[in-house]
Amino acid sequence: SKEMILGSSGNQGAGAFYSHQIEQSARLDYADNSHFDRNYGDGTDGSNTDFTLSFWIKRVGRFGSTSILINPRDGTSGTALNEVGWDTSNQFYFNNSNSGDTILKTNAVFRDPTSWFNLVISADLNNGTNSERLKIYLNGSEMTYATDNRGSYTSAAGFGRGGSWVLGDYYSGTSYTPDMYLAEHVYIDGTTYGPDSFGETKGGVWIPKSVSGLTFGTLGYYLKFEDSSNLGNDSSGND
């Protein structure tokens, strides 16, 4: 897979090489149970079939322990949700927890405490081709999967649903917070984008692109983590 260079916030160089630089990141710390809560009004729904997520991440600990990256929950039922993160084998997974199914789990493991990487999740759940319904990309390339249940997956239980979403933990409060740095996290509601909307290859490395021209949709958000007094500030224009 391609190496990823973050830019100024990764202390790996800047200047003319980067068309877009990520300036800040947030530290999610298991010891402090640090995470983000995003609360939508119940019944304020978007699309639970077409959505995209992008994360720029550096894991620094909690290897070998279940670590939840994002846990969106339907506010109407309170129990319908998705769960996305790393399992005890450090494989990355996407669960539809309402049915208890693991939809995708990667062959690759994530246990490098030094490198930044970009994860993109693209969903087009009405697609008639099973392999096109849900994809996970690492630094611009689609990953291969140890578990693949996309054939039975046609609507998300949590994504696209108004309710209480948790970034960096499980909704019940049981601590599954990862130890990691998180930069420029984007959720797109209603549109399926590929990884080239969030990054590009330059000089053999994967670097960030500006997302300011993307359509964020009803429930979409854009977290830059640039305001230390309000790290969860949404830069998408929806707040």
Tell me the role of every PLM-derived stretch:
Residues 29-51, 102-111, 171-174, 208-214:
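Short surface loop/edge beta-strand patches of beta-sandwich-type extracellular domains
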Residues 6-30, 54-63, 83-154:
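Extracellular glycan-interaction surfaces
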Residues 31-93, 127-130, 191-196:
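Extracellular glycan-recognition modules
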Residues 70-81, 133-144, 203-208, 238-239:
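Short edge-strand/loop segments of extracellular domains
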Residues 46-47, 86, 112, 158-161, ...:
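Extracellular/periplasmic catalytic domains that process cell-envelope and extracellular macromolecules
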Residues 1-24, 31-32, 128-130, 144-150, ...:
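Extended recognition patches within non-cytosolic domains
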Residues 53-61, 119-121, 167, 182-187, ...:
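Short hydrophobic/aromatic patches on beta-strands that form ligand-binding or substrate-lining surfaces
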Residues 157-182:
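Extracellular glycan-interaction patches encoded by glycine-rich segments
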